Amino acid sequence: MNRRRRSRSTDQASSPSKRRKIVACQRCHDHKIKCSGDQPCAKCRQVGCADKCQYTPRDRQVKVSESYLNLLESENQRLKEQSASSANATEADHDAEPEPVPPADAPDESNTSVRNPLIGDRAWFHRYDPSTPPLFIGEAACTAFATRFRRFLTGNNALPHIPRTQYVKEEQIAEANATNVQWPSFHQARLLVKIAIRQVGSIYHLVLRKSTLEKLEEIYRTGDFDCTVNQCKFFALFAFGEAYSMRAEPLSGSRVPGTSYFARALSLGQVLPERTSITHLETLLLLSLFSYYLNRRHSALVLIGTALRLGLSIGLNHNIPESQLIDPVERQHRIRIWWTIYIFDRMWGSKMGHPSQIPDDDIHLDMPSNISPAQLHEEQFTDTEYLTANVKLARIVGETIAKLYSRRKYSETFLQRVQKLLKALKSWVETLPEHLRLNDDDPGTYMKHISSLHLSFNQCVILTTRPTLLHLLMKLNETNSPSTNHESISQPVLTLGEACIHAARHSHTLILTKWINGSLPVFGYFHAHYLFSSALVLAMSSFLPIGSPSDLGAFESGLEVLRSMSENGNLAASEFYHNLEQVKQCLDLRKSKEPKSTSNADQQPSTTASGSGPTIPSTFPPTVSTVPPATTVSDPPLLTTAEADLISNNPGYGHAQGSNPTFTPGNLTFPTTAGGITTAMAFLEPTMQDFLAQSDFDLGLLHPVDTFMNDENLYTCHDL
């Protein structure tokens, strides 16, 4: 017996592992029977209860160090405090509802590795009419940025957003359609179509130039005026022709010429075709673009969205086999129509902060190309390289909205995303063909499509960098003490601010040069928009050490040009002028609260406004700006004395279609020299090159002043 016990103990000691104790399933445990420990166990399979064989989960005990427990407790406390502060930082115009504290295991969405740092926890809505749904305000919209700036100037984070009311209402469109809109005479129709092709067809590919004129002649020759498809297309073209050749259209009840033709074309295209045609897509493009002339931005977005979906239904985003479409003109037209839809989708969305409607990964189409013979190409199409550059720029614009103004989750920091976007913009401007570059020696010779391309580029730079510029202004205001100096602001923030100011000055110069030369369209949307965007940045620049006090004069010039455009019937200019006028009132109010100072007049202006207004410390050391400041129109490189006298003695000089501004040359601002500012200049500065050359690791180690990019969103952390 003892030998047997010793043998058993010896076997157990020599066993490599102790036998695991079998845990019974719930059924075997209740019946107090032996369980095999399988899943399902043998007893449950035997009685047909295999699906009910369940085991009670075991709560094992593990040993951890005390330091690890302390680390978990401190991390838990940090997340609770961060969640509470994030919940309290909400928009002032939102309903004051307490936000629920997220559970401890919820992802930390205030970190840029999870969510965009530029926007708040909730979307921005503004109710201005109780009978309609609240308006969504996209942070990428320039009017939204103007509201943020006005809140900063006044120190009032409850300052309401200014809604857009200057647009052609649905009742006015219905009234315009009710008029007896007829085909014009052949000669007038041909003239209107040629004007439309010349003015908008040089910027976007909308129609085949020669084929469109030939089709117009065929319609008048055969008398076939009843085709709805043709009537929609040509009435839309007539609308553009009138917008660029007339000053007003009183019979339509609208301030914008061409509204009657637009209303008629829109009504005829209400029924969407089940089998769409390229002609119908052309019409949707024309109607979408003209909607901007009526300042109907939402309608424009809906129309281009319809065109995109119809284009997908016929596979425009794919290459069609040559065997199924032999005609090279039709093949190239198909390609270019899609890319125009693509450009509109990206550009229209960027104006309001809406996402792109199709990702780039779903597009499998060749870029535009030339066809042979060259004469045939020139008769039907515009410059291929210009359209290609426009497509590439639109792609960057779409990425800017997605990476900086959306709630998508990214592992990269804010500065890393900005750096990648600026690298793409730098590559775009460096690879731009020579004939698409601006002629710095003679700014008056800029062709319309080239200047439009560079204005779009500058706006993309502004979109990418202006949140940082506003952040810089806020940081100078937060700590009103001599300790706030240029060393407390990281160099990347200063560099991005300078790039934003440079782009704004360049756009301002291009548009005012067009205004003086009389080539600025009265009823266009985009020049008014770009002027408004640049004026906001220049107003901010006048307060910053990297800017110049003279930029405030450029702001005043932009305000006067928008006022004159508004008086001539430009609805978009009316909206933007009203916004800038409110900004000017905030600037004047801020200036009136400044104490009288006997310091050097050349010192950077500072503000010590009383009350709740912001205060920028006057002790901020001046930083050498690499962007040439604006100067008055009296500088000889741009205007001679005779030209200045001509403008002074003739108020209508240089203004399209007989506009009558009241401002004098002394209020106008221009660059020091005609070639003083170039599109690529901001990317040539050493500080910008250093920023673009930094690694992701370096940009991930943010300067203390930039922790807002990791911890709090840009606007709500400043109570705007």
Give the ranges of each region predicted by the language model.
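Intrinsically disordered, low-complexity transcriptional activation domains
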Residues: 134, 410, 613-720
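C-terminal transcriptional activation/regulatory domains of eukaryotic transcription factors
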Residues: 158-279, 284-296, 323-329, 374-382, ...
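"A position-specific structural signal for the A-helix of alpha-solenoid helical repeats
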Residues: 240, 286, 340, 344, ...
